[in-house]
Amino acid sequence: MGEKLQKILARAGHGSRREIEAIIQQGRVSVDGKVSKLGDRVEVTQSTKIRLDGHLLSIKESEENVCRVLAYYKPEGELCTRNDPEGRPTVFDRLPKLRGSRWVAVGRLDVNTSGLLLFTTDGELANRLMHPSREVEREYAVRVFGQIDDDKIKQLSRGVQLEDGPAAFRTISYQGGEGINQWYNVTLTEGRNREVRRLWEAVGVQVSRLIRVRYGDINLPKGLPRGGWTELDLKATNYLRELVELDVETVSKLPVEKDRRRVKANQIRRAVKRHTEVSGRQVAGRQGSARKGSTRQNVGNAAPAATASRRSGPKKRG
């Protein structure tokens, strides 16, 4: 009977299921030369040819796919888009390159928000984690500017009316601060656009800093620099998969990637060592030639050589 085309493409990392459903509806996907419709089922074999805008896509059979997840520390100023017409930096710029697949972002953070952003090669996993029905908890550290009293905290906990419907924080905990700049940690179970900021603004308080520190039970890794990423191990990856009722993985590419980096590092060290040895032999050869030449010079030439040596020494910093 096969499997729905959008699920196959999502699992292969060609986008989230919602993104893929949109491009199928636009008539941009074909299977074995026939334009596909939303809801089509496909039995993937070695001879199956799926194309997007005429370009052949890499589709592995389900047992060959390995789910990978990255934790990325998004800095402020980066956009959650693959390509920006104005050439501004995006969250995809720093991610490791993939062959035959691509990273799918699990949700979004607005340009002025920093913190934890997950990426995966499994679009179905991304789609389920983002879906409001799953109620996956997100935690944010928020620095707010303004007068805050118990009534406002109660409002935010009970719920306020936003333009796109009612919203509330699941938890609010005070973290300290100075003057009217105060830090709070808040949690939500959905990811509406600018929801944290809009909730605070609804009670007359401005957000001056916003950092996502947790997604489900995955915390922003300690020591990870802004703009840095780390790949989750098999245990953490399977936690996310079980959270949204997907089959667990039995293998991980993480050890393979570590081995590749170790081999690359060893190759670099060997190249540097060879370069040092060659340079050393060349310097020794030049010095030997210079010593032989100096025996044919008279002693009066030593003073100019010493002067030249002093001139070639380190310059004073102005």
UniProtKB/Swiss-Prot annotation:
Residues 3-75 form the S4 RNA-binding domain. The active site is at residue 110. It comes from Yersinia pestis. Residues 271-318 are annotated as: Disordered. GO terms for molecular function: 23S rRNA pseudouridine(2605) synthase activity; RNA binding. It comes from the Bacteria. Its EC number is 5.4.99.22. This is Ribosomal large subunit pseudouridine synthase B. It catalyses: uridine(2605) in 23S rRNA = pseudouridine(2605) in 23S rRNA. It is an enzyme of class 5 (isomerase). Keywords: Isomerase, RNA-binding, rRNA processing. One of its GO terms (biological process) is enzyme-directed rRNA pseudouridine synthesis. Responsible for synthesis of pseudouridine from uracil-2605 in 23S ribosomal RNA. The lineage of its organism: Bacteria, Pseudomonadati, Pseudomonadota, Gammaproteobacteria, Enterobacterales. Belongs to the pseudouridine synthase RsuA family. PROSITE patterns: PSI_RSU, S4. InterPro entries: PsdUridine_synth_cat_dom_sf, PsdUridine_synth_RsuA/RluA, PsdUridine_synth_RsuA/RluB/E/F, PsdUridine_synth_RsuA/RluB_CS, RsuA_PseudoU_synthase, S4_RNA-bd, S4_RNA-bd_sf. The keyword ATP-binding does not apply. The keyword rRNA processing applies. SUPFAM superfamilies: Alpha-L RNA-binding motif, Pseudouridine synthase.
